[in-house]
Amino acid sequence: MTIAAAPARQTDRSATGFNPAYVTTAKAVSVPVQVPPATVVSEGLGKDALISWFRGEFAAANAIIDAMCSHLRIAEEAVSGSEYEAVFAAIHRRRLNWIPVLQMQKYHSIAEVAIELQKVAAKKAEDLKQKKTEEEAEEDLKEVVATEEEEVKKECFNGEKVTENDVNGDVEDVEDDSPTSDITDSGSHQDVHQTVVADTAHQIICHSHEDCDARSCEIKPIKGFQAKEQVKGHTVNVVKGLKLYEELLKEDEISKLLDFVAELREAGINGKLAGESFILFNKQIKGNKRELIQLGVPIFGHVKADENSNDTNNSVNIEPIPPLLESVIDHFVTWRLIPEYKRPNGCVINFFEEGEYSQPFLKPPHLEQPISTLVLSESTMAYGRILSSDNEGNFRGPLTLSLKQGSLLVMRGNSADMARHVMCPSQNKRVSITFFRIRPDTYHNHSQPNSPRNDGVMTMWQPYQMTPTPFLNGYDHSIDMMPKLGVLRPPMVMMAPPPVQPMILPSPNVMGTGGGTGVFLPWASVNSSRKHVKHLPPRAQKKRLLPLPPAASSSPAGGSTSEPVITVG
């Protein structure tokens, strides 16, 4: 009997037959997708994220405002001077209450705005340079035309004389001593023209601008000076940022400057300089006599006799910076030793005889960085936060520099803010020129009629009541004065602080009585209730404090005092 084969099961792995229906069925099977449950965000977390975003955008907007103000400042200084200073001051006052919110706040980059501002500034600088070139070309053309007209006039005058002689038939040499003579007038004009040309030649420090431009590639600074001192418990290099450029000027340029400052000194001694341009003090003190000439914006000045005078013109009157020294500043800017936006607006010429020395100088707050000193003679200068000296003015400090003739010292950073510098005595005569920039808001008179007058100048003739000023870059530069031990005391220069805008404080009754940290957010209410801190004692939590001790018997009856009274029997 034949046994029929049973049909193979679909699960039999030994089956050799191919069943496409099975494959199709296997492919058609779908796997369900599991959807994760929706994340629920709390309302408080959403508000915190939104406030964080607002703060970041707020900080970015503040950075954009800073970039725009810097752009306007650079643009206006290159064109027409300070016109937006009042606007900048108003913006700064308006943003004072932003500081607690924006302190250490991170924000997205504003590099795109900064790059566009740089492009605009570069284009404006190029246009301004092209405009100056065109103006110089027009001036040169006018000078050429004027010279040709003068020559034509001279030829016409000579022709008229010859014609008159030919008509009369007599040729005679006539000496005309009349002051209205054409020949005399033309000769005097020629002399004046030659004098003007000579004066113009003396107004430029160099003979060839091409040579000066090529010299910029050869100028290499000497830097990396070290003078370690203790500042608030930390070892700090107090001369960081000091750069020295040796033999910056040539011998003929130094000779021209020496002759020029000698003429200025003679004019100052004879009283021919305006106002307080020439200053002579300590005349009877041997070795410490000082002669100096200040030009441009004043840094020293006398105290006026009438302090209560309402005369608005009662200001320090000095000579402007002469063209020759302006040419020196132009070369420093061209050689990129001083940035254009920090161009000096004042300078002081110091004269030292044999054995004379200066008092240590520390940058006052109303002077900007950098400060540059050009020495026209071989000199020795000492640097340091603390300087020691003997009775003959031999100063010793952490750093002593022997400077060659024509060297330039550029002081930035710690070397300008922390370190004092002094000119040491020497056996030869010395001349130095210090270039500086005074902040515009310190020498513009914005004071009220009844407020004390402040010109932003350093007063050397009468002490004033010292007022606390903020430390520069977070350090305290006050030093105990111990002259008997040989440690140098600070220079006896009374410094007028920069004008401070008045701050309006609310009444004590309006301010909240609760405790606080002093940082108030804009959306916080002043009179909001506050829970007591748990770690305070129960008496303080219930606001029951101990009564104050009674006042001393020496105080008047019915009166109170905020300070304890000590009675000595």
UniProtKB/Swiss-Prot annotation:
Keywords: Coiled coil, Dioxygenase, Iron, Metal-binding, Oxidoreductase. Residues 180-189 have a biased composition (Polar residues). Disruption phenotype: Reduced vegetative growth and late flowering. Binds 1 Fe(2+) ion per subunit. Residues 551-560 have a biased composition (Low complexity). It catalyses: an N(6)-methyladenosine in mRNA + 2-oxoglutarate + O2 = an adenosine in mRNA + formaldehyde + succinate + CO2. Residues 167-179 have a biased composition (Acidic residues). Residues 531-545 have a biased composition (Basic residues). Residues 118-151 form a coiled coil. It comes from the Eukaryota. 2-oxoglutarate binds at residue 430. This is RNA demethylase ALKBH10B. The lineage of its organism: Eukaryota, Viridiplantae, Streptophyta, Embryophyta, Tracheophyta.
